[in-house]
Amino acid sequence: MRIAVLLFAIFFFMSQVLPARGKFKEICERPNGSCRDFCLETEIHVGRCLNSQPCCLPLGHQPRIESTTPKKD
């Protein structure tokens, strides 16, 4: 019975395939953040990851706010 449990554990851990780049995606302290060399135009820089890359957080759907300064007549 121990051999069956051991074989199950070995096959279970071997089935966990690494991503194509050979390492797990590192995430930053924010739940939706990701570590990149440079943040995209639709992301903001919110901190640093453990590998010293910027932690980028997607902006999402932000409403566009028009300027409220009065126009000169």
Swiss-Prot record:
Localization, UniProt: Secreted
GO BP terms, alphabetized: defense response to bacterium; innate immune response
InterPro entries: Beta_defensin_dom (IPR025933)
GO cellular component, one term: extracellular region
Residues of the signal peptide: 1-22
Disulfide bond positions: C28-C55, C35-C49, C39-C56
Keyword field: Antibiotic, Antimicrobial, Defensin, Disulfide bond, Secreted, Signal
Entry annotated with the keyword Disulfide bond: yes
Tissue specificity as recorded in UniProt: Specifically expressed in testis. Low expression is detected also in liver.
Function: Has antibacterial activity.
Homology family: Belongs to the beta-defensin family.
Protein name, as recorded: Beta-defensin 108B
Organism per entry: Homo sapiens (Human)
